[in-house]
Amino acid sequence: MSAWIVAARRTAVVPRGGAFARLSIEDLGAPVVRAVLADSGVEAVDELVVSNALGAGGNPARRVALAAGLEVAGLTIDRQCAGGLDALRLAAALVESGAEAVLAGGVESYSRRPLRLATDPDGGAPVAYDEAPFTPWPDRDPGMAEAAARLADRLGMSRAAQEAFAVESHRKALAAVPAGIVELAGVARDAFPRRLTPAVAARAKGVAGSVTAATMAVAADGAAFCLVVGDKLAARFPRAMRIVAGATLGSDPLEPGLSAIAPMRAVLDRAGIGAGELERVELMEAFAVQAMATIEALGLDMGRVNPEGGGLAFGHPVGASGAMLAVRLFHGLRGGHGLAGIAGAGGVGAALLVQARDSTEPGRI
């Protein structure tokens, strides 16, 4: 039994405080879920798996399911940036164990995220925090921007090189015709891509070391979902994308920017596929240096990586970002193999290898 993605939709990605600022996670997620079901003609699913990193509990998947009119319990996962791809891997496992259809993806509202307070064991006033701890060791838990700056120093990647990468990401995003977007709050296009020039990038505010506001992804709101089904149901669809392999691995938490490399390499090795055989790669660009290091380490063809731009141009709706990669693969891959990869806080990375079935060959792979 194989697992297949047969429909995929997403919202636009909008920086926090923008057009989605008043929308809850169910406001973001439910319209996308309904659109996926409408596209597929599937009326009922066995489960809804939702990645969410900032919602502070309450089972967001159940809330999205109820808002979308689904009679499922809903399963929420939190693996931070890696969660969107993990949701798809869980959906594939459910299908391979007997489920007929599972919706999976992620939703994030940076704008509406709850405020978080750490209690004082000595009875003092609670202390607000914005970024959760990702390791049990305060001295080995660097901020993401700080870790990216250290990585750039170690690898000798200059600020100018990072800026050039960001400029190219925006250029590709502006030139692309996005597919699969569900219009929401009047927004039908990603809101952040702009005509970033080298001169403008050079004036960007420094964040940490050589990392600037131009070379790290902005915090954003958004949702993305895919419908995952088995062989029998997949045969009905002219376009389908088989989930070939997936992996989520832990690596050095001091260098989280490198954490996508091992799982991406693992799925390629498992399938016996070389990097040069990939038709398309969707790699999350949380930081320019992170994406550049991953591309170099795996020997990826730059012309096939993020051909419609990446996270530097779109933004980073944390729990939804991995699912966004899968949606872009679904709409952009016309044959052959595609790879999605994402690095995450705490040194966790995820990858998903897929193979597209050509629309002229229903039932074959």
Language-model region placement:
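Conserved catalytic cysteine-centered active-site region
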Residues: 23, 51-100, 139-144, 195-218, ...
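Condensing-enzyme catalytic core mediating Claisen C-C bond formation in acyl metabolism
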Residues: 1-26, 199-258, 262, 266, ...
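Active-site pocket-lining segment
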Residues: 244-313
